[in-house]
Amino acid sequence: MLEQGHRIGFAENACLFTNAPDTWRQFIHQRQRWSRGLIEALKLHWRLLFKRRMSTLFIWWNLLFPYLDLVYTLAYIPGIILALFGIFWIVGPMTLLVLPLGLLINYLMYSVQVKMFTEQGLKVRRNPLGFMGYALFYNLVLQPACVVGYVQEILNRTKQWGTK
């Protein structure tokens, strides 16, 4: 659509429901598929990076995700594991100061979602333990799965749906 000169917009109160994966395996395959889709879109529509439009910034922003996911997977996760054994070569005690900020950002996003759901007449259940688990551990699963998806697409591996 953008290549044809059409505009896209942002709907801040858009609300959509879908079927979520039932198992970790399905979830990981879904994340890999979405990551492959990002690389595929960048390969097919790279010209959009050079069109002078406001939305071009967001396309450039997508170029950061593979890099950030790769650094998180190859440096931060091993750094956490080493830190658990007292080896602070990559991640040190000061990293713990970032955790409250991460929890705050996740809580702010949760608050915005609760407000939006309330406006739609929907109820969000409270699950503090689930929220903490999500905020602290979700990325430990998400980023490595995404990196595998990026590599699969770059190497032109056979695509599989993988969620059925």
Task: Walk through the language-model features, giving the residues of each.
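Generic hydrophobic, helix-prone segments enriched in Leu/Val/Ile
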Residues: 5-7, 59, 95-96, 124
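Membrane-interface alpha-helices
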Residues: 13, 151-164
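Non-transmembrane catalytic domains and loops of membrane-associated enzymes and transporters
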Residues: 1-56, 64, 163
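Hydrophobic alpha-helical segments
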Residues: 26, 37, 43-44, 51, ...
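Membrane-embedded multi-pass helical conduit in multi-pass membrane proteins
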Residues: 65-155
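Short, structured coil/loop segments at alpha-helix boundaries
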Residues: 52-58, 87-88, 92
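Hydrophobic alpha-helical segments of integral membrane proteins
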Residues: 24-27, 34-38, 42, 60, ...
